[in-house]
């Protein structure tokens, strides 16, 4: 059998054709002593097909907690013994958060709400926030508001939402182990409508929720079929009181192999470091990830957990001589 890294070099690096599901599994199964070679190849692929720029994004939780869904990893579910809840953010708070995000050099600001899908009150608050931000801050606005109807997709597009995030979370075959209150197909339908409306699609998931390597490879193939503009990669940070609260953190080498494997499966896609990387990888692992296929980061804190200080990520990018992606000139 041909060495999978030699195959990937010819197929992915030279021709820009992502690995298929079986090939991705072979990468995930590589022994740890091949990790450095794997990361180096993934970095070459990233530089060849995405370039040196790194997109920086900040996120804010407009509505925290009280969600009716049972996503087993999430402390914002109202169904678990993990009460995370706070008042809705008002418009001035959204604007101030966008300003602080822009000061880091970020070009993307994502407004997030813990809901199954937005109701009229939430959409009105989002619309008011977007209008105020666009009047005061030079930044692209993304949203993550759960599952949408066709009419809601159209309204968000008309508001000027640049990109919509809705994660598939995991492989289709593993989804019912993670969520039971809605289906994988419902999430897929929202993503399809978002693309049809002309917004960029942002879709990723969480690694380390008990899925097998085969299912991790399946998930990469699911994402390749969707072909999103951006894939955020999260690593499970077990939350007390949730069904996944007692799972072990993914070993760093396994997490880095996954990062590189997803890059080789998705050579032209923006691959973003998201939640959980602090406890899974630490500072050294963050550097290895950025030198192993990652070309986008979330700076600052996440929705319910602390992230690395924005300054630490920005200093790392500067040390690695990786420029922050400039704001789209069309804005």
Swiss-Prot record:
The keyword Membrane does not apply. Its cofactor is [4Fe-4S] cluster; [2Fe-2S] cluster. Pfam families: BATS (PF06968), Radical_SAM (PF04055). It comes from the Bacteria. Binds 1 [4Fe-4S] cluster. The cluster is coordinated with 3 cysteines and an exchangeable S-adenosyl-L-methionine. Pathway: Cofactor biosynthesis; biotin biosynthesis; biotin from 7,8-diaminononanoate: step 2/2. Coiled coil: none annotated. It is an enzyme of class 2 (transferase). [4Fe-4S] cluster binds at residues 67, 71, 74. GO terms for biological process: biotin biosynthetic process. Belongs to the radical SAM superfamily. Biotin synthase family. This is Biotin synthase. The lineage of its organism: Bacteria, Bacillati, Actinomycetota, Actinomycetes, Mycobacteriales.
């Amino acid at each position: 059998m041909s060495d999978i890294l030699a195959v990937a070099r010819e197929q992915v690096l030279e021709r820009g054709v992502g690995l298929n599901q079986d090939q991705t599994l072979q990468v995930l199964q590589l022994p740890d002593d091949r990790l450095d070679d794997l990361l180096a190849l993934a970095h070459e692929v990233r530089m060849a097909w995405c370039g040196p720029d790194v997109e920086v994004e900040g996120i804010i939780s407009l509505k925290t907690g009280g969600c009716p869904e049972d996503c087993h990893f999430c402390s914002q579910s109202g169904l678990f013994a993990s009460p995370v809840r706070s008042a809705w953010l008002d418009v001035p708070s959204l604007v101030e958060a966008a300003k602080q995000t822009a000061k880091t050099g970020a070009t993307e600001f994502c407004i997030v709400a813990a809901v199954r899908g937005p109701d009229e009150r939430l959409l009105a608050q989002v619309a008011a926030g977007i209008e105020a931000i666009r009047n005061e801050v030079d930044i692209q606005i993304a949203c993550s508001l759960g599952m949408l109807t066709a009419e809601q997709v159209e309204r968000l597009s008309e508001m000027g939402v640049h990109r919509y995030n809705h994660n598939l979370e995991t492989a289709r075959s593993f989804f019912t182990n993670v969520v039971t209150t809605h289906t994988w197909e419902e999430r897929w339908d929202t993503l399809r409508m978002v693309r049809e409306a002309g917004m960029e699609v942002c879709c990723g998931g969480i690694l380390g929720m008990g899925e097998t390597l085969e299912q991790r490879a399946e998930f990469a193939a699911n994402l390749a079929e969707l072909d999103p503009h951006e894939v955020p990669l999260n690593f499970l940070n077990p939350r007390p009181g949730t069904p996944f609260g007692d799972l072990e953190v993914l070993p760093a080498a396994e997490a880095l192999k996954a990062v590189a494997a997803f890059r080789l499966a998705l050579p032209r896609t923006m691959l973003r470091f998201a939640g959980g990387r602090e406890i899974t990888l630490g500072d050294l692992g963050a550097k290895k990830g950025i030198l192993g296929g990652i070309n986008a980061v979330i700076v600052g804190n996440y929705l319910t957990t602390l992230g690395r200080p924005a300054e630490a990520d920005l200093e790392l990018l500067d040390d690695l001589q990786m420029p922050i992606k400039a704001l789209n000139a069309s804005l």
